[in-house]
Structure formats: C-alpha cells, structure tokens
Amino acid sequence: MSSIPTQNIYDDPKFFKAYSTLPRSQHGFDAAPEWPVLQEMVLKNNKSGHSGIENEHVLDLGCGYGWFTRWARENGAKYVKGMDVSTKMIERAKESEQDLREKGSIPPSYGTLCYEVGDIETVSFSASEIDSYDLVYSSLTYHYIEDFSKLLQQIRLCLKKGSPKDGSRKGGRLIFSVEHPICTAPVNPQPDWKVLPNEDGDGVGRKIWPLNSYSDEGPRVTSWLGVDGVRKYHRTVETYVTALLQNGYVLTGLKDWVPSEHDVEEHPEWKDERHRPYFLLISAEIHSDY
C-alpha cells in the first residue's frame, strides 16, 4: 500500500482552470511534439511481429481529456477504456464523447469506448479484465506514481499473455511516456535554464540545464500552474528499465525525446530543448516465459 495518499491536483478548481489553457489541453496531439514517436511505437511492428491496434482491447491509464482513447477507437481498436484519478478529467472526456455523438461523428463501425474514475496508484482489475488487454498506454502519468514496480505487476496481470510455443497469440504491450529523469532530478528546482557568462566577454550568455541529485530517487515537490505542493517521483532511467525487466517485460523501444532539427526549423523557440531530453518514451511487451 502506498505510504502517501494519492495526489489529485487536477480536481483543484484553480489548477484545472489553468491546465485547461495549456496547448495540450486545447489542441491535443497537435500540441504534443513527442506524439509522432509514441504513435510509431503504438503502430509499428514489435519483436513479436505485432502491428497496429485494429480489433485490440486498449487501456489508457491517466487518460486525461481522452485524446488517446478517441484516437485508438478511430484507428480500429475494438474496446477502449480510459481511467483517471481526476473526476474533472473524466467529466471532460465524457463531454467530448457526447459532443461527438451529438454531431453524428461516431460511425456504427467504431468500437466501444468507456471511462472510469480510478486511482492508478492502487489499481486492481476485475476477473473479466485479467489477461484481456492487448495494449496499456499512458502519457505523462507514471512520474506521479510512488510505487512503479507495484503498478507494473498489476498491468502485467491485465495484459494478454503470449503463446511461447507456436506464437499464435501475441503478448500484450505497454507503452508510456514520462518526464525525463534529467528534468525530474533537481531538488528544489529553480528556473529551468541557467545562463553562464560567455568566455569571450561579449555579453551573450550560454544556457545550461542545471542537474543535481540524479541518483537520489524519491519525491520531488514543486509549484506548477500556480499551485504549490505538486508531487512527482524521480527515478533514473536505469530504474525504469530495471523495473520492467524484473516484472516480466521485454524492452522493445526507448527514446530520449528531444526536438528534431526539422522540429526546430518549424519551431525556432525549441532550439534550446535539443540540449537535453525532455521526455522518456518506452515500449515493452510481456515476456512469454515469465
């Protein structure tokens, strides 16, 4: 059991109002620069030869406004479930779904989509959900989770198990993104970038990313969107990968996400973001012999 009560900052009216103004909230994937890489992870062939999500059962943990759940259904998933600890998030996702229905934008051929308020920190699955999901997806949620290993164990229970002998059934997949550990590491973080004096003395400083306490894992408390006490959990890249391997997963993809040169051409304001990774993107699947 978690030693610290689950944090639910998104139901704070002040925070939720501020969050709703973010580009990601208003424009979804169009404002999520890491999405093309995540999308490729979802759709590409993995080591078991699996491709796409057509007719799959998909679970989105920390679904927020439901951007991914709707995308999964549009791309052929047979059943999609979104879960979030925030009642306000789930209400917003349901409102978007209702808007689509009223506009007649949900063809009869689309699969089932449902939402549930649930605490991912203590998630457990019904008997009908055990060994039932082809894909568990999560975007920018797991760095809020205290016991990542425990969560991986629960997810493994609900993912479909593969057929190791004849390969007739492919193992379920886990794909997720988190804030990169280089970003979550600093204790008492100051403004993101620091400027060093230029050695040439021309007055133009050089930006660096201040990194400290990388190996000291655990909670980090920051202020975000005008709300104090926002709690995240810092883990090293090694810890994320080791937890997967120790809990019966095979690593199939890992990306230290930075903007590409093409991204910077379209968004010059992202130039400094190429100096350090901002997101960690990981794909894995169930180990058939675990």
Placement of each model-derived feature along the sequence:
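Nucleotide donor/acceptor-binding cores
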Residues: 55-57, 172
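Class I SAM-dependent methyltransferase SAM/SAH-binding core
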Residues: 59-61, 65-123
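A short acidic, Gly/Pro-enriched loop at the edge of an enzyme's catalytic core
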Residues: 121, 125-136
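A short SAM/SAH-binding and catalytic strip from SAM-dependent methyltransferases
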Residues: 134-149
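A short glycine-rich, Lys/Arg-flanked "PGG" loop and its adjoining helix->strand segment in the class I
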Residues: 149-170
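SAM-dependent methyltransferase
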Residues: 162-164, 173-242
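C-terminal lobe and adjacent flexible extensions of AdoMet/dcAdoMet transferase-like proteins
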Residues: 239-290
